[in-house]
Amino acid sequence: MNQITDKYPTCEITIQGKKFKGLVDTGVDISIISLQHWPSTWSIHPAQFNIVGVGKAPEVYQSSYILHCEGPNGQRGTIQPIITSVPINLWGRDLLQ
């Protein structure tokens, strides 16, 4: 497991037209978006799994939908992120596919 520090590069991703900044190359498989950054109008449901390595998260959700996203250089893709109480968004391997 990698320790998350300020040495990781950041990247801004646009999801459904909303910009999110997060850390890249953190070792997570599925991207994690901070609950405080997640729009309250976007649907979520309780995740059917636990997350490991980012501390003890009391509430773990997942986006109810697969969302369209765009990288900083116009790369297009889809994402169904995890949403929980982390201090910063963590971009995972799911965005590298």
Where are these regions (language model features)?
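Short glycine- and acidic-rich boundary segments immediately preceding or forming the N-terminal edge
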Residues: 1-3
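Aspartic protease
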Residues: 8, 14-97
